[in-house]
């Protein structure tokens, strides 16, 4: 339906053949959602037009009777809200939003109470009579174009004079003011240059708050470490923020500054000084261009983890902020992760009466669950303790660990992790204050309570719209090892049948089948390849840097033992030829050799650099039957338009609560957790 029917009053209109949902952005019902039938809307418009009044001036009170009773955000739906929806009174409506997008509509009708009537993807057809109404000069609000703006950073001394550290090194105990703003130009006094900050403003959004968080171990900071810049729709920021700092010591000294919007990482600036020395000042920037994203969903917690000389610098942002340096070197990190993943493998290989229970079935007896649950909780608890409460942990590290655990023990959160090579099996972290093996609480596993996305931190990070456009249909490729069926039963063929059924019921779905290395390489070397989802169901081997062949030897094994390595991909399908369709890559590596703790070093960076929007991967080998079941349940929800993070959390909880199966924790998201298809392919 055209958004200009009610002129500047309307922000969004969507619906079904029976219902139209409208949001008003100004006037009597500003911010209100109404639900109305096409017939009633047509009558209202005709009556208003009959009085020779412009449609853009139609009063909101004319629609007050159609006001929706309950409006929720997906991220805030809890037990109370679900109960309200389930017991809606007849004639009442409940609307669920995902940001500014309409997600589901519920009605109190006895026939459909508690069931969603529509998805945001369903669009209505406008009756001819409505289309013929003259809309006059009404203007439709729309997303204004993104304006290119720059972060400026400059130093001033105590006398308020500009200070250029590239000309004169700073001195120990000397107090400076470190200043930040956002401007239309990169000014000459800025000690960083051409550092762009882009953001896509929403309709009706005039000013946004950008959080500036400063962290350092090398400088005294005489201010709050977190401040806000207010960025208007156009022009420079409304304000500047300043931090008074003084070097604690001579030599290498670093200041790290993180920029966030609603908990979402935007930009990282690292300023490096040689205090009292002669080494030139330097800086490094890593950032994301958010102007391509229609709506940025808030994140409750952001963890930015940076490589440092002493280990890893961890910056916590959110309701509580903190910074600490983890005295952990890469070899120790690998060993920690290896031990944690051994616990996962202990579940995969659990043997009782000569039966590998988790490999033979998806539904696990409760008695078996109670035997494996304490060992996984111990591994997750031990991993958290080694990170934050080891003998080498200083008070800052321990304090950050306590704060983070306290936050994560409360309400469910969306967690965003940015790191360079600090890659954990985040889902298995067990967040109890003390480990009580006789009373393990599954909700204290991070992955059974929270949504977690892990995004690689790199220069010029590509940000892709989190909606996969399926207006013309969906193209998915199944890249499989058919030999799996010869030894394990019809696991590949069952997935082919699943997709054939989807295709037959949805002519706009195109399924591409590939079984060999050359077929996959041929597709990946073509920038115009049609794949929107690249799904792999095959064996996989992930090599560490120090192992024979290194990362280049990481392998996906297709039919006929056809081995596709990272080396093959880099030579025959190089990253310079980016995939224009920006596919989502799902590597469902089953019954494979144990994956390296740094699988991140192989397939994830290759596909992201190649243009993929992100990767779904596994922490270690997954039983073949479970991999098929996870994929089926995943695509059932994904094709309905649900977001990846919501799918992961729901499936993990569903499989554990209903089947006593913990293996959902084996899967990880290296992609924006709000990624979804739009419009949906199938309905509820």
Per-segment meaning from a language model:
Residues 92-97, 253-261:
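Short, aromatic- and glycine-rich surface loops/edge beta-strands on solvent-exposed regions
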Residues 118, 122-161, 271-324:
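Acidic, serine/threonine- and proline-rich intrinsically disordered appendage/tail regions
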Residues 150-201:
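Contiguous beta-strand segments within globular domains
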Residues 306-395, 399, 406-410, 418-422, ...:
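A domain-level signal for caspase-like cysteine endopeptidase catalytic cores
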Residues 437, 541-613, 630:
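Cysteine protease catalytic core and zymogen-processing segment of caspase-like enzymes
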Residues 443-470, 559-580, 625, 629-684:
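Caspase-like cysteine protease fold
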